Amino acid sequence: MAEKYVIAIDEGTTSARAIVFDKELNILGIGQNEFTQYYPQPGYVEHSPEEIWQAQLLAINKALEKAKIDRNNILSIGITNQRETTVMWDTRTGKPIYNAIVWQDRRTAPITDYLKANYLRLIKDRTGLVPDPYFSASKIKWILDNIPNAREKAEKGEIKFGTIDTYLIWKLTNGKAHVTDYSNASRTMLFNIRKLEWDREILEILNIPEAILPDVKPSSEIYGYAEILNSSIPISGDAGDQQAALFGQIAFNQGDVKCTYGTGSFILLNTGSNLVSSNDLLTTIAWGVGKGITYALEGSIFITGAAVQWFRDGLRAIDVSDEIEPLAGSVPDNGGVYFVPAFTGLGAPYWDPYARGLIIGITRGTTKAHIARAILESMAYQTMDVLGIMQRDSGIKIDALKVDGGASKNDLLMQFQADILKMKVVRPKIMETTSMGVAMLAGLSVGYWNSMDELKQKWKIDQVFEPKMDDEYREKLYSGWKEAVRRALGWAKTIGG
């Protein structure tokens, strides 16, 4: 019998990707296509859904060409996606009624300010989220209120809403399936994560018709069949990108935690079947497999890798990002310099939009190497901030941090991360954890892999970083960071700008 394969569709914020995996989780082929970012007004960020669709089809074809396999041997498809980004389309024509409003878009702040002032506790208790333009709910309301005939069509059932996974499943199945999974639904700010259903009271508050919303299903089951590649292939896995990365890190047990270092960083802690509430972090659904639901705590750090980009492009201190590691390693320590990357405020656990970036502790002896080191160290300090709150609010002791994303390749940073956390930092062999996670979910539901235990055997470690720093020095460094953050907080409110 011919060997079968799983293809992961990974629709991100800047590009559409596809990766072909075999049963041993080897990567056979990768396809990637970037698409346009639209900024029609300050605070607005949009994508063209049709451009995403075309980019995704090209990525699938590229991945299959590179894999050099018979297309008839694709057993199933998994879809992972940028979360919260909102698409609405006409069910008759299949065409979007407006561009996709991206998770970064801030135009709906007046809506969410109203919700925060009047319904904060209700929304937090039911959805696990804090009212913010980040999530889908206010984006849906904006489209219904501002696009001609949108509300009228929605009331008649002529319009559908979806996060990007839902839109792609609709397109792949030629309009036969209008579905999402628990993890994506939990990022809309409309889904009751306790009852596992759309929350009618929140829908009424926002005047959103329930008829436009997709069916919500577990993250590993057959949602429909993709009519592409001249065959009918089951779409059998679906998860938001950060939840897929948690699954791809084999973080199946309560207390398992991962940090993805990208432009910003996302930290997710598996809290098992326990729905843990936190004032400083988001409560979300990690995944649903079978009849069980796994919950997670999430901390979002706004600026990590973007600080390296600023050091490269803004200060022109380095030519390419990879140069920061040897530069930072050329000095034995930070020389008393701290860098707080509050370019757009601070996320978890501070949630201060008025904080601003700060470099402090500069002396005549400070060099760009000290600043480079302070930038890398800021990523580790912010991770420590979030993990501290996670342990406090969940009551779960965290023993190790699993890492992925671009900056996790930086050995100096990973060693400092282990030192400052006083815990092991574990880096996997395959860094494509998001795509791998949804490939696993897709393969499980069609029997490609028989169990999560089987998947554990296939996951391989690249390196484990053990903590080496003494306690007194660790505490001194971290107290310096906390003092630097204190000085950055509220800056824009104090002096304006």
Swiss-Prot record:
ATP binds at T13, T14, S15, T263, G305, Q309, G406. GO terms for biological process: glycerol catabolic process; glycerol metabolic process; glycerol-3-phosphate metabolic process. Belongs to the FGGY kinase family. One of its GO terms (molecular function) is glycerol kinase activity. SUPFAM superfamilies: Actin-like ATPase domain (SSF53067). It holds the Pfam family FGGY_N. Its EC number is 2.7.1.30. Key enzyme in the regulation of glycerol uptake and metabolism. Catalyzes the phosphorylation of glycerol to yield sn-glycerol 3-phosphate. It comes from Sulfolobus acidocaldarius (strain ATCC 33909 / DSM 639 / JCM 8929 / NBRC 15157 / NCIMB 11770). Sn-glycerol 3-phosphate binds at T13, R83, E84, Y134, D241. PROSITE patterns: FGGY_KINASES_1, FGGY_KINASES_2. It catalyses: glycerol + ATP = sn-glycerol 3-phosphate + ADP + H(+). Glycerol binds at R83, E84, Y134, D241, Q242. InterPro entries: ATPase_NBD, Carb_kinase_FGGY, Carb_kinase_FGGY_CS, FGGY_C, FGGY_N, Glycerol_kin. This is Glycerol kinase 2. ADP binds at T13, R17, T263, G305, G406, N410. Keywords: ATP-binding, Glycerol metabolism, Kinase, Nucleotide-binding, Transferase. One of its GO terms (cellular component) is cytosol. Pathway: Polyol metabolism; glycerol degradation via glycerol kinase pathway; sn-glycerol 3-phosphate from glycerol: step 1/1.
